[in-house]
C-alpha cells in the first residue's frame, strides 16, 4: 500500500514535469524562430531552471509515503523545498554571472513553467465517484 501511494505521487509528478518540459521547449522554439537564437537560448535556460529545481523537489517529496513514515514524509518535503529554492538561486546566479542572456525570455519562460506548476494539477483531479 505504501509503495502504491508513493508511485501515484511519482506518476503525477512525472506528468507535470513532462508538461512543463514540453511547454518550455515549445516556448524556446517559438522565441528562437520569432526573434532570434539568443532569445531561444534564454528561454530554454529560464524554463530549464524551473524544471530542474522542480524535478529535484519531486524526487525528494515522494521518497516516503504512508502513515508510519509521517515524520520522514514531512522531512523529505521540507528538504525537497529547501533544495528547490537553493538550486533555483544557484542556477539563476550562474546564468546571470556566466552567460549573456536576454532577461525577457528568461523570466517569461520561468514564469510560464511556474504558471503551469500552479494550474496544471487541476487537470489531474479525478472527480469520478
UniProtKB/Swiss-Prot annotation:
BP term (GO), one: proton transmembrane transport
InterPro entries (UniProt xref): ATP_synth_I (IPR005598)
Signal peptide annotation: none
UniProt keyword Transmembrane helix, yes or no: yes
GO cellular component: plasma membrane; proton-transporting ATP synthase complex
Pfam families listed in its UniProt record: ATP-synt_I
Transmembrane domains' residue ranges: 16-36, 44-64, 77-97, 105-125
Entry keyword set: Cell inner membrane, Cell membrane, CF(0), Hydrogen ion transport, Ion transport, Membrane, Transmembrane, Transmembrane helix, Transport
Top-level division of the source organism's lineage: Bacteria
Localization per record: Cell inner membrane
Membrane topology annotation: Multi-pass membrane protein
Family statement drawn from the similarity comment of this UniProt entry: Belongs to the bacterial AtpI family.
UniProt function note: A possible function for this protein is to guide the assembly of the membrane sector of the ATPase enzyme complex.
Name of this chain's protein: ATP synthase protein I
Species this chain originates from: Vibrio cholerae serotype O1 (strain ATCC 39315 / El Tor Inaba N16961)
Amino acid at each position: 500500500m505504501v509503495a502504491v501511494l508513493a508511485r501515484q505521487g511519482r506518476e503525477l509528478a512525472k506528468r507535470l514535469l513532462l508538461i512543463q518540459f514540453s511547454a518550455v521547449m515549445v516556448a524556446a522554439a517559438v522565441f528562437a524562430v520569432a526573434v532570434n537564437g539568443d532569445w531561444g537560448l534564454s528561454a530554454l535556460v529560464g524554463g530549464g531552471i524551473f524544471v530542474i529545481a522542480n524535478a529535484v523537489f519531486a524526487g525528494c517529496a515522494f521518497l516516503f509515503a504512508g502513515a508510519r513514515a509521517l515524520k520522514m514524509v514531512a522531512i523529505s518535503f521540507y528538504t525537497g523545498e529547501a533544495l528547490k529554492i537553493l538550486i533555483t538561486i544557484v542556477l539563476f546566479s550562474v546564468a546571470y554571472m556566466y552567460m549573456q542572456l536576454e532577461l525577457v525570455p528568461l523570466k517569461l519562460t520561468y514564469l510560464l513553467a511556474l504558471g503551469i506548476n500552479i494550474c496544471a494539477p487541476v487537470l489531474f483531479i479525478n472527480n469520478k465517484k
